[in-house]
Amino acid sequence: MSKEQYIEFPEEYTRRELNARYREIPLKDTTSRLLRKYFNAMANLYGIIPLHKAKEIVFSLSPKLVTEDEFLAFAEIARHECEGYYILGGDELYTDVKHTKPLEREIIDVTLIGESIDLFIETKRSQQEKPYYVPDKKHLLEYDDPFYCEDTPEKTALRRFMEERLGLSGEKLEDAFDDLLYGVRSVSSSVEGVLSHFDK
């Protein structure tokens, strides 16, 4: 059973306090910034990813970046960041989970938890038993931008359609494309909902 009414999020620390805690690990500022980019990118790309899988991806793409202890220490502090993700365990999301081990916590895109956790639950259900697409390091880190979309022939064709057929250009095209991209990525979107963007 989910904690629909009240989720107690970890306390948010100031940037100064966060930096001081990261240095206690000790992590260089560049290392903590890179890990933060990884976490944001994974939240944007996957929506939800367990820390043990995030660790596996970071270790495969940046093998000498951190040790397992440093990764866990970073994740514990990062729970107190104000970023595009939460790091929460089942014990914080559900009433029937007593304790979540640190590596079982999940990096969760902030858009999946609002007044309810229905989007989170729906996303988690849709991910079951599916493999993770893991791009190379450069491409994964591009997902740090929540509106990043890989350049594909389909993206080019859609943008051309929006320009030529819908008469969109400049900022209006960018806004419409971002809205459409967000709608497509949302697990709760329907075909009708996505197509309604073309009526605007």
Q: Which residue stretches match the model-derived regions?
A:
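Extended alpha-helical interaction scaffolds used for oligomerization/partner binding
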Residues: 130-200
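Charge-enriched amphipathic alpha-helical scaffolds
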Residues: 59-95, 99, 187-200
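Positively charged, polyanion-binding regions of nucleic-acid-associated proteins
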Residues: 23-50
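A short acidic, leucine-rich amphipathic alpha-helix
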Residues: 53-58
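Charged low-complexity interaction tracts in eukaryotic proteins
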Residues: 4-24, 30, 73-135
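Short coil/loop linkers at secondary-structure junctions
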Residues: 49, 64-65, 169
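Non-catalytic, well-ordered alpha-helical scaffold segments
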Residues: 33-37, 52, 69-72, 156, ...
